[in-house]
């Protein structure tokens, strides 16, 4: 496992950082020495997160915006360069959930979910990659889902967005490996976040379930990003002990 100085010379950009997995991932990287750029739409939450990181002796800055807006992606990468002179790791975590049958899903809802989960991943990666190529290396992780590995009834559009992330990452691995850039996906099962609500699940039932804590997923993300230079993790599935493997 990474120690307190593993990422001391690294600058990390985390999208969807105002809660859940993104929040815990930013805290975890900062706790291991990384300089962190965080982004999401809720500015008050980002400010709270950065204040917490700084209070613990870390370095963090934020940019509030919609991850599906290209200007947000551009500004976040530029902020990393301005404040930390580099960008080493991109965690594409921004996203949304949807638990609806196909016949209850509108075209507008399809577009919104695809924008949140896939377009945001494309935009941030598109703006981060030139920086990483210039640096002769970097790492990009997509926080997908077990819903990207198999289809679940009542989640067709959500599954489609997560399958898209995995395919995108697999293609990029082939494109970017020659530049020293590692690309992979993390596929969590059930996690105690706001996106777990639905299909009869309430906030209380989620909190009392055996679902993964966001912090546990963050630990898997840091593990994937702390591999030796000559090895990479292409895909990692993380499930809680009460969840079947398939």
Model-predicted segments: where are they?
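Conserved glycine-rich cofactor-binding loop
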Residues: 18-19
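Conserved glycine-rich Rossmann-like NAD(P)H-binding loop of the short-chain dehydrogenase/reductase
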Residues: 32-49
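The beta1-alpha1 cofactor-binding region of Rossmann-like NAD(H)/NADP(H)-dependent oxidoreductases
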Residues: 43-44, 64-76, 107
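Substrate-binding pocket helix/loop in short-chain dehydrogenase/reductase
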Residues: 101-102, 109-114
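Active-site helix of classical SDR
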Residues: 125, 161
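Residue(s) in the substrate-gating loop at a strand-loop-helix junction
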Residues: 145
């Amino acid at each position: 496992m990474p120690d307190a100085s593993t990422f001391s010379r690294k600058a990390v950009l985390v999208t969807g950082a105002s809660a859940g997995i993104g929040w815990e991932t930013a805290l975890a990287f900062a706790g291991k020495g990384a300089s962190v750029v965080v982004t999401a739409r809720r500015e008050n939450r980002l400010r709270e997160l950065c204040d917490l990181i700084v209070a613990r002796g870390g370095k963090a800055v934020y940019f509030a915006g919609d991850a599906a807006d290209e200007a947000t992606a551009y500004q976040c990468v530029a902020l990393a360069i301005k404040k930390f002179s580099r960008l080493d790791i991109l965690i594409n975590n921004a996203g949304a959930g949807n638990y609806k049958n196909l016949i209850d899903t509108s075209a507008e809802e399809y577009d919104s979910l695809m924008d949140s989960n896939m377009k945001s991943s494309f935009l941030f990666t598109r703006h981060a990659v030139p920086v990483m190529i210039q640096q002769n290396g970097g790492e990009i992780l997509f926080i997908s889902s077990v819903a990207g590995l198999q289809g679940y009834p009542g989640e067709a559009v959500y599954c489609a967005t997560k399958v898209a992330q995995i395919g995108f990452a697999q293609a990029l691995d082939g494109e970017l490996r020659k530049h020293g850039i590692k690309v992979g996906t993390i596929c969590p099962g059930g996690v105690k976040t706001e996106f777990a609500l639905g299909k009869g699940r309430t906030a209380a039932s989620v909190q009392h379930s055996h679902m993964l804590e966001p912090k546990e997923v963050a630990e898997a993300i840091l593990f994937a990003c702390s591999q030796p230079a000559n090895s990479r993790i292409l895909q990692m599935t993380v499930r809680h002990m009460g969840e079947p493997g398939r």
